[in-house]
Design a protein with these regions (language model features):
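Nuclease-adjacent, charged terminal/linker segments that flank catalytic cores
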Residues: 1-97, 306-309
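Short acidic loop-to-helix transition motifs that present clustered carboxylates
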Residues: 84, 91, 150-152, 190, ...
């Protein structure tokens, strides 16, 4: 039994190692398809006009690509198991071989399937975040991600967990919360939104855009969310199918236009020198980080060029 447990433990570790080697990161997958679809060549207005289509196409293309890669990944792991005792299958029919293989490696097969399921769930959220960030960049909306600024800027750990982006940035959030917006990306809604509303009230932030693809938000939840200054943002197709009569649900195109108008309020703002230097250092770091992703690098170079220190 101990030997079997060790074999299973070793196989689980092999899954982890091979997954990190064979599967691209969620961002890399999305960015590759972003360029493949030619969005990196589009102008700013294209993103304002077609954000919903861009998001749908990027999601679909990334899913198609991912399934191909995951299939090859799973194939390699099953081959790894088969190679351990391939001699035992030589004189068997295909049916006999499959029966023996599945019987002998039930735990390993389950471990791989479970790992694939968990990976899909995790990747779906991260890919969605990457898509939204690229759309914001394409529309030339200034923002920073929670990952680039850390959670310390927010009043509570609960709020920090929910916020993915701050428009236009952490400096502005500290200087004047009423002229900033928080963006939370969730493929589906599972949070306890009453608590989120309480957190929002304490921050004095103007609003939170809850970006989602959830097609089954109840009327009760929509009313609760609206009460707490949280605006649902989704694609035009999801609105047409599910939320035509919901005033608190807007399209990605609507959100981009609202954010653009909000950013105008920061033109000619008298920033403290320390905040400007912090912004400059952040953008320089991000330019280096995304040196191999020209579209992203160009976005941050543009943001940096707009800073007058």
């Amino acid at each position: 039994m101990t030997n079997l447990n060790n074999q299973l433990k070793e196989f689980k570790n092999t899954i982890k190692v091979e997954r990190s080697k064979l599967l691209p990161s969620p961002f890399d997958m999305v960015y590759k398809n972003f360029e493949k679809l030619g969005y990196h060549k589009q102008n700013e207005q294209f993103f304002y006009d077609n954000a919903s289509i861009i998001i749908d196409e990027l999601r679909n293309q990334s899913w198609i690509e991912f399934k191909k890669i995951e299939k090859e990944f799973s194939k390699k792991l099953y081959s790894h198991l088969l190679d351990q005792d391939s001699e035992n299958y030589k004189n068997m029919t295909v049916k006999e071989g499959i029966e023996k293989f599945t019987s002998k490696h039930t735990d390993e097969i389950y471990a791989l399937q479970l790992s694939n399921t968990q990976s899909r769930r995790s990747r779906a959220g991260k890919e969605f975040e990457s898509i939204i960030e690229l759309v914001l960049m394409g529309a030339n909306i200034e923002f920073v991600t929670q990952g680039s600024i850390g959670s310390g800027v927010f009043e509570s750990s609960e709020l920090a967990k929910l916020v993915n982006c701050v428009v236009p940035g952490a400096a502005e959030y500290n200087l004047n919360k009423r002229n900033t917006s928080l963006i939370s990306t969730k493929t589906s809604l599972r949070e306890r939104w009453q608590e989120v509303g309480d957190e929002m009230s304490r921050t004095k932030a103007k609003e939170m855009y809850l970006v989602t693809l959830d097609e089954s938000i109840s009327e009760k939840t929509l009313k609760l969310i609206e009460k707490n200054n949280i605006i649902i943002v989704t694609t035009k197709s999801v609105i047409d199918k599910n939320y035509l009569n919901s005033s608190n649900v807007i399209s990605f195109e609507d959100m981009l236009n609202e954010l653009h108008i909000q950013l105008l309020q920061w033109n000619n703002y008298g920033y403290p020198a320390t905040e400007l230097n912090n912004k400059k250092e952040l953008y320089q770091t991000l330019i280096e980080k995304y040196d191999g992703n020209m579209f992203v690098r160009n976005y941050y170079e543009n943001m940096l060029s707009n800073i007058n220190v």
